[in-house]
């Protein structure tokens, strides 16, 4: 097998998978957000399309890895916030509640077009978030590139009540899930 390419501009994903010596090529895929109820197909299709968009850019046979993360509250998908107000609204909506963080990973062989996809779900419960705490977080960390308006690795004390599941999954990609999916190509 040739090289492996991460079709992502996420520094968090690149860091989690750094031991794999992946080439990084940000996916040119443009996400079309349609506010729908959550389904695994939704996030898995985004991961697949991100990887697929890199295939024409590659000449030698390679494994292309795409990923997408969504935050889900009930059936509502909380994507990346549009602006400050949207980020504030999302974080206040998550206050005192348990939500799911779902990351889908797709791996495509650029030559054969064989692909495998899986999803990992983790759960996060937030404490009661004051307006001041939320405003301070948004002003300091500018979470506008993060699903659900937060990065768990940068949340200050006072945010998290409980985490269930794979922390890497919440950050952006589970190395365990990636390794398991990669086995299908060996």
Describe each PLM feature range.
Residues 91-140:
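Conserved core of the sugar-phosphate nucleotidyltransferase
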Residues 16, 20-29, 106-113, 143-157:
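Mobile beta-alpha loop/short-helix "lid" or hinge segments that flank ligand
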Residues 42, 69-99, 126:
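Active-site-adjacent loop/tail segments of enzyme domains
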Residues 17, 47, 68, 87, ...:
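Residue-level signal for inorganic ion chemistry
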Residues 72, 106-108, 160-162:
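Short beta-strand-to-turn element immediately C-terminal to the catalytic PLP-Schiff-base lysine
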Residues 63-69:
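Ordered, amphipathic secondary-structure segments that act as subunit-interaction surfaces
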Residues 3-15, 121-186:
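GST superfamily/GST-like fold recognition
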Residues 1-63, 75-77, 129-132, 179, ...:
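N-terminal polybasic phosphate/anion-binding patch
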């Amino acid at each position: 097998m040739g090289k492996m390419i991460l079709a992502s501009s996420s520094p968090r994903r690149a860091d989690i998978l750094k031991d794999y010596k992946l080439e990084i090529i940000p996916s040119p895929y443009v996400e079309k957000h349609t506010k729908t109820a959550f389904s695994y197909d939704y996030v898995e299709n985004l991961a697949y399309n991100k990887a697929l968009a890199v295939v024409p850019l590659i000449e030698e046979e390679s494994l292309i890895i795409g990923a997408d993360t969504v935050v889900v509250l009930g059936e509502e998908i909380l994507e990346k916030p549009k602006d400050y107000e949207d980020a504030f609204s999302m974080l206040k909506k998550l206050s005192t509640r348990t939500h799911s963080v779902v990351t889908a990973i797709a791996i495509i062989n650029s030559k054969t077009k064989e692909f495998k996809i899986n999803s990992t779900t983790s759960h996060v419960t937030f404490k009661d978030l004051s307006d001041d705490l939320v405003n301070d977080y948004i002003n300091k960390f500018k979470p506008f590139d993060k699903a659900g308006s937060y990065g768990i690795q940068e949340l200050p004390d006072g945010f998290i009540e409980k985490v269930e599941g794979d922390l890497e999954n919440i950050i952006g990609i589970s190395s365990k899930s990636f390794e398991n999916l990669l086995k299908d190509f060996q």
